[in-house]
Structure formats: C-alpha cells, structure tokens
C-alpha cells in the first residue's frame, strides 16, 4: 500500500476486515508482523507512538478518546505541538470549529457526540500534523456536523497540504472528498484506485454489510 503525499486516501471494507488495525499499526499501537512502514523513505516500524507523533503523524481514533473530566480548553492543550513547545491555542484551528470557542470551559464529557468529534479533530490539528489519520470520523454524527468535518478535512488538505488517511463507511462522504480509495477484504487490499472505482458493482458487493 502506497499513500500519496498531500492526498486524501480512504480505506474501506466490511467490519472486521482489519481497517482499524491498519491505522493503529501506522501510528505505532501495533507492530507489523510482516512487512514494514516507510515514512518519507525511512522505516518507522520500530518507532514508538510518541516518536511517530514527533515526525508529524496525528491520530483521531474511533470513540474520540477525549478526557471527559477535562474542559474543552484543557483537552485542546493536550494536543499542542510537542515539537515546538507551543502553549497557545491556534486561533486558526479554533476558527474551523466555531462551537468549540463557545465551550472552552465546559467538560468534554458534557459535549454531544458531534461536538466531541470536533474536539478530537481540533486537538489533532493543534499538533500541526503532516499526516492526519482518522478512524470513521462520521460515525454516529448528524449531517450538519458531517458537513463541517468534510469542509475541515478538505481545508487542511488544500491549505495546509496535509496528507489525510481515513477509514470511512459512508459512501457519499468518501465520494465527496477522497482522491484515492483502498478496499480491504480479509486483511488484504482487494482493490485500489481513484474514487470512481466505488461505482463498480463488485466493489459495492464487497462493501455491503
């Protein structure tokens, strides 16, 4: 699997096919038992997650993993750039999610699912990542917030030149934003290519739940 710099790459497949495991291997939660992971020409397979974060990889997992007893502001501070010892919130990142600016003193656990997802993505963006990795960012999210998330992903790709890698099941969302798609079946890449491959009936059958 080769992920192109500056592109939005979507990984799709039925539940249980290894999509989340793949993302967690990229960011260092698992080590590959076969093959290796190259990033900018360097094998990073043995690096710990924090070492990969220093290289510019940021991850928004399924479930968001925000801190429920920390305020929104405190949650955001946990994502500040560990490379630059920055201790100020980036107003540009906050401007992408206006609702968060209104909730800085609220506890993370008091937010709705959609608000928590915005918080999780904003926290990752505060790391100023070169590669943003998201695991099903639209899961359980209302349409209005899905649009916000879509606009943010496109913005950071086009303006910040950030490489985006995401696992996603929502067809319309993928067709709107993806440059390339990898279809995973039983832990292997079944097919890959431009987003137009999703129109293939065989692909739709593979992805049918």
Give the location of each predicted region.
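Conserved ABC ATPase signature
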Residues: 107-111, 115
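Conserved ABC transporter NBD signature motif
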Residues: 35-42, 55, 88-95, 191
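ABC ATPase NBD coupling module
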Residues: 43-63, 102-105, 198-204
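ABC ATPase signature
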Residues: 70, 111, 124-125
């Amino acid at each position: 699997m080769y992920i192109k710099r500056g592109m939005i790459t979507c990984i799709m497949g039925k539940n249980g096919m290894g999509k989340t495991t793949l993302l967690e291997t990229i960011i260092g939660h698992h080590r590959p038992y076969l093959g290796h992971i190259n990033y900018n020409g360097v094998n990073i397979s043995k690096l710990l997650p924090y070492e990969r974060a220093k290289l510019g990889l940021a991850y928004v997992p399924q479930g968001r993993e925000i801190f429920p007893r920390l305020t929104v502001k405190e949650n955001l501070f946990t994502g500040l750039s560990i490379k630059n010892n920055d201790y100020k919130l980036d107003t540009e990142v906050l401007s992408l999610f206006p609702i968060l600016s209104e909730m800085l003193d609220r506890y993370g656990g008091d937010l709705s699912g959609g608000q928590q997802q915005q918080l999780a993505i904003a926290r990752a963006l505060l790391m100023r990542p070169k590669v943003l990795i998201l695991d099903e960012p639209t899961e359980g999210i209302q349409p209005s917030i899905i649009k916000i998330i879509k606009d943010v992903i496109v913005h950071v790709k086009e303006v910040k030149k950030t490489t985006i890698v995401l696992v996603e099941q929502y067809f319309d969302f993928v067709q709107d934003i993806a440059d390339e798609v990898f279809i995973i079946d039983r832990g292997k890449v079944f097919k890959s290519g431009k987003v137009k491959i999703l129109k293939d009936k065989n692909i739709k059958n593979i992805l049918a739940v």
